[in-house]
């Protein structure tokens, strides 16, 4: 890859979510970003696919009347051809453990990109139980954005995607007690 990366950005919380906007702004500092995200909340839809989707222009790119996997397919097929990386998030709520493969729209978008042979990063924000469902602010995603931006800047060149189809990042809320980083396979 020469120059700044081309980034297809999606999520499952919808194109108007604070997490997507925060990631868009952070990633725009290091690359060319095109958002192709659901027009409305599509949380917990897994890898569901639609037979047809409507696509609307949006100030960040495109709003798709469909699932996160639909967004990746539409993006890779027509709206953001040949990106260097697909980023999905920043999700409101962690995506940890094996069960997320079947449920999480955020992780499923990264999996869909991997099926197309495109490196992908799924990014989520851990929320304590009492905050879940209450929404998040733009600023609460700053650590998730920082980690994801770092990975987009550096991971593509390291060869990590020769061994991993996608990365699943889960960041704490700002101000939470730091925990040790764990890399799992």
Residue ranges, per PLM feature:
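Internal, conserved structured core segments that host functional sites
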Residues: 84-131
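Short, glycine-rich nucleotide/cofactor-binding loops
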Residues: 9-16, 98-102
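Hydrophobic/aromatic beta-strand patches that form the interior of the parallel beta-sheet core
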Residues: 34-36, 62, 87, 119-123, ...
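A cross-family phosphate/adenosyl-ligand binding-site feature
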Residues: 2, 7, 17, 21-82
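Glycine-rich beta-alpha junction loops
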Residues: 39-42, 127, 170-176
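Short glycine-rich anion-binding loops that position phosphate/pyrophosphate groups of nucleotides
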Residues: 13, 41, 67-68, 91-94, ...
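Electrostatically charged, flexible surface regions
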Residues: 139-185
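Glycine- and Gly-Pro-enriched alpha-helical subdomains that act as flexible
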Residues: 122, 134, 148-151
């Amino acid at each position: 890859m020469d120059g700044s990366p081309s980034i297809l950005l999606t999520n499952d919380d919808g194109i108007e979510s604070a997490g997507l906007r925060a990631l868009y702004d952070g990633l725009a500092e290091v690359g060319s970003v095109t958002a192709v995200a659901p027009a409305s909340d599509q949380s917990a839809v897994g890898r569901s696919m639609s037979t047809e989707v409507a696509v609307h222009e949006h100030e960040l790119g495109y709003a798709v009347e469909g699932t996160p996997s639909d967004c990746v397919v539409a993006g890779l097929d027509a709206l953001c051809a040949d990106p260097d990386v697909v980023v999905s998030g920043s999700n409101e709520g962690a995506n940890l453990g094996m069960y997320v493969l079947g449920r999480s729209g955020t992780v499923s978008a990264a999996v869909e990109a991997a099926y197309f042979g495109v490196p992908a990063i799924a990014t989520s924000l851990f929320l304590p139980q009492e905050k879940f469902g209450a929404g998040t602010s733009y600023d609460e995603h700053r650590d998730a954005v920082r980690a994801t931006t770092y990975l987009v800047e550096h991971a593509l060149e390291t060869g990590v995607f020769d061994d991993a189809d996608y990365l699943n990042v889960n960041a704490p809320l700002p101000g939470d007690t730091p925990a040790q980083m764990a890399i799992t396979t």
